[in-house]
């Protein structure tokens, strides 16, 4: 799950480059939305990975 958090974080960074950098002005609004969406998903995956690691009992 930690790997997925890293993947979503990288996607968020790429969306930020396009959205905030002005490279693609036509898609800037969509890229900004995708940045925040994938950033939230990355944080959720990171938190769930950390919580799942703590709850392992054998």
UniProtKB/Swiss-Prot annotation:
The chain crosses the membrane at residues 4-24, 33-53. InterPro entries: DUF1328. Belongs to the UPF0391 family. This is UPF0391 membrane protein Gbem_0127. Keywords: Cell membrane, Membrane, Transmembrane, Transmembrane helix. It comes from Citrifermentans bemidjiense (strain ATCC BAA-1014 / DSM 16622 / JCM 12645 / Bem). GO terms for cellular component: plasma membrane. It is found in: Cell membrane.
